[in-house]
A protein has these predicted regions:
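N-terminal nucleotide-binding beta1-loop-alpha1 segment
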Residues: 1-17
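Hydrophobic targeting segments
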Residues: 2-7, 30, 45-48
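Conserved SAM-binding loop
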Residues: 6, 22-23, 48, 100
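Short beta-strand/turn micro-motifs composed of small residues
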Residues: 9, 50-51, 102, 129
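A short, N-terminal amphipathic alpha-helix
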Residues: 29-44, 57-61
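Short active-site oxyanion
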Residues: 42-47, 124
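Short phosphate-binding loop-to-helix
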Residues: 47, 53-99, 107-115
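Conserved core of the sugar-phosphate nucleotidyltransferase
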Residues: 80-83, 87, 106-187
Length: 187
């Protein structure tokens, strides 16, 4: 079963130029993701998808492969990660499983990826998640005049310990069947 890791690392970030190779604790931030993927032993190939030669060179120096330069059609601010992963899968001749790993996830570990690979034995996807510290059911919204109101009015008087836990994408990775990425299914 061919399993690949795909690390999208576009060079054209508007907020932080070349953020994927900015130093973080002494090395380019992207290298933490590459090292975790390589050290996990889970992947047949760890691929960085980029449009930037400096990022490609840093990825290669870190042990990842850069078998292609991402086409301009997949490099603007409005392209999501699923088409980028699908392109990588196709560019390397297919895969059975693919793991999208964010380049800006310095706290990802090889153990996280091993556990996710194990979870795929029983599930279609494995996703890194984190719990919200405060109950989201107490969330507020603000209108254009600056007035706030409850999003879930039915929970205004509910004790916080009686509210269900809620989770969010921790932005480390999403691991699943390659076919789901190719079919552009929601992850």
């Amino acid at each position: 079963m061919k399993t690949i890791a795909v690390i999208p690392a576009r060079g054209g970030s508007k907020r932080i130029e070349r953020k994927n190779i900015r130093p973080f604790c002494g090395k380019p931030i992207m290298l933490y993701s590459i090292e975790a993927a390589l050290n996990s032993g889970v992947f047949d190939d760890v691929i960085v998808s980029t449009d930037d030669e400096a990022i490609a060179n840093a990825a290669r120096a870190g042990g990842a492969s850069v078998p292609f330069i991402r086409p301009p059609s997949l490099c603007d601010d409005f392209v999501g990660v699923v088409p980028v992963v699908a392109h990588a899968i196709e560019a390397v001749g297919g895969a059975d499983r693919a793991c999208l790993i964010y380049a800006t996830a310095p706290f990802i570990s090889s153990d996280d990826l091993k556990q996710a690979a194990q979870a795929l034995c029983e599930n279609d996807f494995a996703l890194s998640i984190a719990a919200y510290e405060a109950p989201i059911f107490r969330a507020l919204t603000m209108d254009e005049r600056g007035f706030v109101s409850s999003i879930w009015r039915e929970h205004e008087q509910t004790r916080s310990q009686d509210l269900p836990a809620a989770f969010h994408d921790a932005a480390h990775f999403c691991f699943g069947r390659a076919s789901a990425f190719l079919e552009n299914k929601s992850i």
